[in-house]
């Protein structure tokens, strides 16, 4: 090593090593901070994906519930149409009976 050099050259070498070491420590610290930010960002992305998946499941349930409600409403509509037809027939028959009754009473 530099053990045989002059004290002045050893001091310069020591300062140079300290400077390089400080630079490397700073770079390493910066890299650790960047890595930590990336891990936290990845963790947040994972949270967001989980929340999106939960929201998607809720939306799917809402859609299924809506489909079920629409099926029930279609059945109710069909029943109401049958009832309307029956009422209409009864009104027509009532009108015919009224005419027959009026004819008999004359």
Curated annotation (Swiss-Prot):
Keyword line: Lysosome, Membrane
Database matches in Pfam families: BORCS7 (PF16088)
Subcellular location: Lysosome membrane
PANTHER family to which the protein is assigned, alphabetical: BLOC-1-RELATED COMPLEX SUBUNIT 7 (PTHR31397:SF3), BLOC-1-RELATED COMPLEX SUBUNIT 7 BORSC7 (PTHR31397)
Note, other: Diaskedin is from the ancient Greek diaskedazo, meaning to disperse.
Protein family: Belongs to the BORCS7 family.
Protein name according to UniProt: BLOC-1-related complex subunit 7
Gene name for this UniProt entry: BORCS7
């Amino acid at each position: 090593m530099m053990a045989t050099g002059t004290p002045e050259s050893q001091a310069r070498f020591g300062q140079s090593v300290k400077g390089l070491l400080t630079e490397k420590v700073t770079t390493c610290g910066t890299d650790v901070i960047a890595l930590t930010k990336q891990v936290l960002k990845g963790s947040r992305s994972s949270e967001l994906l989980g929340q999106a998946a939960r929201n998607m499941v809720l939306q799917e349930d809402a859609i299924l519930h809506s489909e079920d409600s629409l099926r029930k409403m279609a059945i109710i509509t069909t029943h109401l149409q049958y009832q309307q037809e029956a009422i209409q027939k009864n009104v027509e028959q009532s009108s015919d009976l009224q005419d027959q009754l009026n004819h008999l009473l004359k």
